Amino acid sequence: MIAHHDRNGVCCRALFCSALQPSDAPTPDMVATAISRAIQQFGIGGCASWMAQEFGDHPDAAASRMRWVRQLIAQRSATRQQAAA
């Protein structure tokens, strides 16, 4: 089983690589679908590689996107924890 923080890391990398944009005003279902599609399309390692490339090529844009991604994943985790309680 993947540890919670590792799962969040995988989800962050996958969501970073997805086509989902802040302007989409993503719902939790949209986030889950984007994560699944990115993992299917690129694989876990591919998502990490693509993300690293973006940070190398466009560090400011990548940092901004990662802040947004981490916010979405944190909200997703909080919602899941509340539902489990």
Residue positions per predicted region:
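N-terminal acidic leader/helix
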Residues: 4-29
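Amphipathic, hydrophobic secondary-structure cores in small proteins
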Residues: 29-74
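A short, ordered amphipathic alpha-helix with a cationic face
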Residues: 2-4, 23-25, 35-41
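Short helix-capping/linker segments at secondary-structure and domain boundaries
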Residues: 21, 79-80
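General marker for long, soluble alpha-helical cores
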Residues: 2, 66-74, 80-85
